[in-house]
């Protein structure tokens, strides 16, 4: 084993001297045993010359002193992968943090892996059914695609993520991996307990590097989650769902260590390697001929500026965007997805078929017309509208309410049984509303129901 000594410590960045001819390679993991017996992992980032390397620590460097012995593991950070990690909570280096003993797996993967080769990629584009009406109809997710989930605090990002995990686990017997990147520890704790209660924990692996962790952990934890997902795709030929919350923090962590590593800052003070780092992560999230990794990434937009380099770089990789809107959440319509702001690359008649495409466009059209009329309604009231416009408003309000649906993971709050709605049922329901087949039903009949038949049944009880 190659042994070195700490020569300098600046925050999360540690310089280590090695004997001549024993320099670790870039990205090799080094370990330090602290005086109290705990282990600390460093990742090699730069060769500074004169047998010295600069590394980034994966945990706090408190208590380290110059001269401490450092061991080179001679390979990148390895994390446990396999069915044993399901139902467990790990940190960036793969150690369990759920207090339920160690994780014993027969295999480990490096967190730095190359993206699949071109000839291994699956080229067919197919829709990934989520069972959530508003998503399946208006911004369908693609299998192996990447979706950005935009939303402020308290509009339901976490509940939507949990419902997706639940639907994939129950309806499609799929596995999910959740990577909490620079998240609030409280939210991670809530997610863990809610998953235990809703019973989806056995189909999910959780990896956390939270806000209180040093930037090294936050910049690498997304890769840890991705490696676990890649195992299920490549070795078990499964379709896996990967949730990253929040992808902005991945970039933010990179920018925090960038200056300490001596790199010149780029636009807005971000690291010059921003596009490369994002590309290396996103290029691994793909479908191969064996299986797929479909990702949903929550994206924080600093100061609501979509041109900020961090969200702008993430945009380039996305296939679909789901925008959660506070104004819709205030109406009590959940999931609070904005049907006019959300987009999908695969909402194309050649991919989803004419029926789906035409219905989606008709829904958007009627909602847009309603939005245009809202100013007139606010000033003059409904009575001043033409009969044609009154009909548009009435149907649009029914469509708006029919876009809501009771969630399995929110049963405790709504008191309603969760609903998984198949795509053909979704299309049929919206087609009937727009065609005027249900003009005689009250709009409250469409609120928080699954299929159109349920709305008709509900109307009878009102």
Swiss-Prot record:
Membrane-related topology note: Peripheral membrane protein
Entry protein name: ATP synthase subunit beta
Pfam families per the UniProt record, alphabetical: ATP-synt_ab, ATP-synt_ab_N, ATP-synt_VA_C
Localization in the cell: Cell inner membrane
Highest taxon, organism lineage: Bacteria
EC supergroup of this enzyme: translocase
Catalytic activity: ATP + H2O + 4 H(+)(in) = ADP + phosphate + 5 H(+)(out)
Record carries keyword Phosphoprotein: no
UniProt main location, coarse: membrane
Quaternary structure (record): F-type ATPases have 2 components, CF(1) - the catalytic core - and CF(0) - the membrane proton channel. CF(1) has five subunits: alpha(3), beta(3), gamma(1), delta(1), epsilon(1). CF(0) has four main subunits: a(1), b(1), b'(1) and c(9-12).
Positions contributing to ATP binding: 151-158
Gene source species: Chlorobium phaeobacteroides (strain DSM 266 / SMG 266 / 2430)
Keyword Oxidoreductase tagged: no
Task of the protein: Produces ATP from ADP in the presence of a proton gradient across the membrane. The catalytic sites are hosted primarily by the beta subunits.
UniProt similarity note: Belongs to the ATPase alpha/beta chains family.
GO cellular component, one term: proton-transporting ATP synthase complex
EC number of the protein: 7.1.2.2
GO molecular function: ATP binding; ATP hydrolysis activity; proton-transporting ATP synthase activity, rotational mechanism
Keywords per UniProt: ATP synthesis, ATP-binding, Cell inner membrane, Cell membrane, CF(1), Hydrogen ion transport, Ion transport, Membrane, Nucleotide-binding, Translocase, Transport
């Amino acid at each position: 084993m190659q042994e070195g000594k700490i020569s300098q410590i600046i925050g999360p960045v540690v310089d280590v001297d090695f004997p001549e001819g024993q320099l670790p390679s870039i990205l090799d993991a080094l370990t330090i045993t602290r005086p109290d017996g705990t282990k600390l992992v460093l990742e090699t980032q730069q060769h500074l010359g004169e047998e010295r390397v600069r590394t980034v620590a994966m945990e706090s460097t408190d208590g380290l002193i110059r001269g401490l012995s450092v061991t080179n593991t001679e390979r990148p950070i390895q994390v446990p992968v396999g069915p044993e990690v399901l139902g467990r909570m790990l940190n960036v280096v793969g150690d369990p943090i759920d207090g339920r003993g160690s994780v014993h797996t027969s295999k480990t993967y490096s967190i730095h892996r190359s993206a699949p080769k071109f000839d291994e990629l699956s080229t067919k584009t197919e829709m990934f059914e989520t069972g959530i009406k508003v998503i399946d109809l208006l911004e369908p997710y693609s299998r192996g695609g990447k979706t950005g989930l935009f939303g402020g605090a308290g509009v339901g990002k976490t509940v939507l993520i949990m419902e997706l995990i639940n639907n994939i686990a129950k309806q499609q017997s799929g596995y999910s991996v959740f990577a909490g990147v620079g998240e609030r520890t409280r939210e991670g704790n809530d997610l863990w307990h809610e998953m235990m209660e809703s019973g989806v924990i056995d189909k999910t692996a959780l990896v956390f590097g939270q806000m209180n962790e040093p930037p090294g952990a936050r910049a690498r934890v997304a890769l840890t989650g991705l490696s676990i997902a890649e195992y299920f795709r490549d070795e078990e030929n499964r379709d896996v769902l990967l949730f990253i919350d929040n992808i902005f923090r991945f970039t933010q962590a990179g920018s925090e260590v960038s200056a300490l590593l001596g790199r010149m800052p780029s636009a807005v003070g971000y690291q010059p390697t921003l596009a490369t780092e994002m590309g290396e992560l996103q290029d691994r999230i793909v479908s191969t001929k064996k299986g797929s990794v479909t990702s949903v990434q929550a994206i924080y937009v600093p100061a609501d500026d979509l041109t900020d380099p961090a969200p702008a770089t993430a945009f380039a990789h996305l296939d679909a965007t789901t925008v959660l809107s506070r104004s819709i959440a205030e109406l009590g319509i959940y999931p609070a997805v904005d049907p006019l702001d959300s987009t999908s690359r695969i909402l194309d008649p050649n991919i989803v078929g004419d029926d789906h495409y035409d219905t989606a466009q008709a829904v958007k059209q009627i909602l847009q017309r309603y939005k245009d009329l809202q100013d007139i309604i606010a000033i003059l009231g409904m009575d001043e509208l033409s009969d044609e416009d009154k009909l548009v408003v009435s149907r649009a309000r029914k469509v708006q309410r029919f876009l809501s649906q009771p969630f399995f993971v929110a049963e405790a709050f709504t008191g309603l049984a969760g609903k998984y709605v198949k795509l053909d049922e979704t299309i049929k329901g919206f087609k009937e509303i727009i065609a005027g087949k249900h003009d005689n039903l009250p709009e409250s009949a469409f609120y928080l129901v699954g299929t159109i038949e349920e709305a008709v049944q509900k109307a009878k009880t009102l």
